[in-house]
Amino acid sequence: MTQQYDEAELRAQLTEQYKHLESIGLNELSSGNVSCRFGDNMLISPSGATGSNICSEHVVEVTLDGEWGGDRKPSSEWRMHAAIYKETKAQAVVHTHSDHCVAIACQGRGLPGFHYLVGTFGGSDVPWVPYSTFGTEK
């Protein structure tokens, strides 16, 4: 059975995890973003957030079609998060820019399945895709 959380608790958890990711070096400045499923919508970190300026009131509720209200804009990567929620049963998405992953991506090729844990990514390898401008549909 899936445990249900209220909106305030989800916002607080997203904020705490965003700060944690930065504190352990998985994100720097405003790179990376986190979200969670919230009913038929998602809650996502705001555009321009950093570990030092994010708070639970800044987390943005967004429909999976990209509609939101309020003064804050969602992360520019909301489309990627929405696509994952539309296609899977995922309950949360964590997108980081860790130094090691960036270094691997700069090689321009996927990560081969050299260890059984690669299978946790859903295949026999971790694929690579060419760079595209962040926040676009591409």
Please annotate each region the language model reported.
Residues M1-K138:
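Glycine-rich flexible loops
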